[in-house]
Amino acid sequence: WLSGLLPDGGVALSGLRQHINCRPDKRSAIRRGLLVATLMLAGCSHPQPEQEGRPQAWLEPGARVTLPAPGISPAVSSQQLLTGSFNGKTQSLLVMLNADDKKLTLAGLSSVGIRLFLVTYDEKGLHAEQSIVVPQLPPASQVLADVMLSHWPISAWQPQLPKGWTLTDIGDKRELRNARGKLVTEITYLNRKGKREPISIEQHVFKYHITI
């Protein structure tokens, strides 16, 4: 669903080395269903060419941002259930995040334990494997950008943002606003055992909501 809202045919993240495994007998079914609208990692037979430098993500149509370096300290390790909603439909998946000062890995599993995607981001760049796309959730690349936006410090993001954009912590929320002051992404946090952890991500431009 998100591919119709993003520029360049819906590629949410550039600089991506990807391998998407789809058997030929499944492709026609995918095309007939909602999955065709969400195969945003450029499809089974046409990988997105790798670009130099760190990967970029769309913030809104016409505005991209280069992601911060993958390292984070202290290290983050979590296993969370993500529930996404779009057009009144919801879907859930289990996401396992591991990040340290050198590398970030993000794996998504279905409710029955089937791996949907695996994303690795390190000094060599971004590598993603995605076999199944869940229509009611953003693609793996967009989930990665949202995860980094919610976990990485503002000091890491601010130099990367387009001119005039702001990222601000206000109480239990983090707000990303464009140069016109419009709220683009809103992240809500909860204090758990002394740690400020994200519990929801609202993307107002691309119209999706993720509950963690």
Task: Show where each model-derived region lies.
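N-terminal mature ectodomain segment of secretory-pathway/periplasmic proteins
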Residues: G71-E123, A128
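Gly/Pro-enriched, hydrophobic low-complexity segments
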Residues: W165-I212
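N-terminal polybasic/positive-inside topogenic patches
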Residues: G4, S14-R17, A29-G33, A37-T38
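Post-signal peptide N-terminal segment of mature Sec-exported envelope proteins
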Residues: G53-S78
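Bacterial signal peptide processing site
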Residues: S45-Q48
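Acidic/charged, solvent-exposed loop-and-adjacent secondary-structure segments enriched in E/D, K/R, S/T
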Residues: H127-W152
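C-terminal motif of bacterial Sec signal peptides marking the signal peptidase cleavage site
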Residues: L41-G43
